A protein has these predicted regions:
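Vicinal oxygen chelate
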Residues: 2-20, 31, 40-90, 98-124, ...
Length: 139
């Protein structure tokens, strides 16, 4: 009998899951996320552009960008009637956040209440990734 823990043991904890986006230009994408969505660059490599990767943070939410020269994300939106999401970000203040970006050209779908109770809106970044911001509305 082994003394090693099982995969579901409480001492083996997953701390987070990080959506990872392939992009052609990590630096330009990181700047877009900072300017339009309030993310900050928590780290990047190497120390100067062109970066191979960057980690972006907004509160506890993290996104990772990985450089693939010439990469273009395929449009998967036609695979299901509701569209295709690349990341779902749960947040407090979703209504207030929506008001700060409302009417911008990167809004993919407006703030709506879903049948399951969440208020959500969608953003499409310059690389074609669709992020959903959802939570309780606070308007």
């Amino acid at each position: 009998m082994s003394d090693s823990p099982s995969p579901g043991s409480p001492e083996i904890r997953i701390r987070s899951a990080v959506p990872t986006f392939l992009v052609d230009d990590v630096g330009a994408t990181a700047r877009w996320y900072a300017e339009h969505l309030g993310f900050r660059t928590a780290g990047h490599f190497p120390s100067s552009e062109p970066y191979a990767y960057a980690s972006l943070m907004r509160g506890p939410a993290e996104l990772m960008l990985l450089r693939v020269a010439g990469y273009r994300k395929p449009d998967l939106s036609g695979l299901r009637p509701e569209g295709s999401w690349d990341a779902y970000i749960r947040m407090d203040g979703v209504g207030a956040f929506y008001e700060t970006v409302r009417g911008r050209d990167f809004i993919h779908a407006p703030l709506v209440k879903r049948p399951y109770g969440d208020w959500e809106f969608e953003v499409r970044d310059p690389n074609g990734y669709v992020l959903v911001f959802g939570g309780d509305v606070d308007l």
